[in-house]
Amino acid sequence: MDTAEAAGDPGPWRQQAILGRRDWDADALRDIVRDYVIEHLADDDAVLVIDETGFLKQGKASCGVARQYTGSAGKITNCQIGVFAAYVSCHGHAFIDRTLYLPKEWTDDPDRLEAVYVPADVGFATKPKLATRMIARAIVASVPFKWVAGDTVYGVGDIEQQLRRAGKGYVLGVNSAHVFRSWGKRQPVSGTAADIARTRRSSDWKRLSAGAGTKGPRLHDWCYLELADLEAEQSNSANNGLWTRGLLIRRRIADGDFAFFTTWCPAGTSIETLVAVEGHRWAIEDSFETAKNEFGLDHNESRSWHGWHRHVSLAMLAFAMMAAIRHRANPPPPKKTNRCPSAKTRTQPRRH
């Protein structure tokens, strides 16, 4: 059932008018949603998760539509791609930002952009670039979070330097050919992520859960290699103290398949903490599924740039309200320690 039918309308025209032809600011609504989420779910140890999802389409008229890969279909298909930021804390999770990705075949065609009312100041931007803008907006808005997590799409570009300067930790996916080198460590490490993983000893691995899944704990084997300790000031960071750059490797128990993550965290951070941060990425996948199934995230009835952002922002608002209600109905049990131990740093004596 599409959103017009669910609303009892005989056709999509009313919703198309509201989303595509009325004059209202979708970015203002986005900011309202963000502030609402923080009001109800804020925690200093929260994780900002960056990911994308596909909106399957027919035809070529909808803004940003192209034949491109989407995990929603698991293949290259005709679709739009939206990049999202989700706020994940021990109180719940919800979206706080979004933007529509425009492929170069769109940004290189001014007539096509004009036909769907793309603003004149919007040009081509890679998905990692869109992510840096979302992170910047969250920082400017004083959103409380300690970590950023993302898959291999977002483990490249300027995100690492941006987060280091902001004093934020991260666990970001990288591909198997990504090169890592250690310095100042007793055990030198050098090579591609895949080569490093293949030379690890059995004692280097630790079986840990990345969180609860639908079938129980999401268990994998993990290996964490500290590559270098750096003073925060070396990255022009707002923070002080020693921070560690590292490589986190995940090995699937069933078939030994590897996944790799570049990490940045306060010195002494445990592997359990980094695994927990990486495991928070599951929350945005759950959010996409729920938002599409329950709130019509992918049932947009308009074709314009403004229509997409308005529709998606409204779906985000509905999801945020559900997350707040769920949190109030299911408060976490009181803890003797800090509120979110899964994403805390274990303090250890300085080794240098």
Roles of regions detected by a PLM:
Residues 1-5, 288-294:
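Short coil/turn segments at secondary-structure boundaries
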Residues 1-172, 176-179, 186-187, 196, ...:
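Conserved, well-structured functional cores that handle cations and Mg-NTP chemistry
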Residues 58-69, 290-302:
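Short amphipathic alpha-helical segments and their helix-coil junctions
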Residues 72-78, 253, 303-312:
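Structural motif
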Residues 74, 91-116, 120, 169-283:
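An anionic, glycine-rich sequence signature occurring as long contiguous blocks
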Residues 263, 269-278, 292-310, 329:
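Short, solvent-exposed helix-loop connector elements
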Residues 282-289, 315, 319:
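Feature representing long, continuous alpha-helical segments
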Residues 297-352:
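Basic, amphipathic alpha-helical segments enriched in Lys/Arg and hydrophobic/aromatic residues
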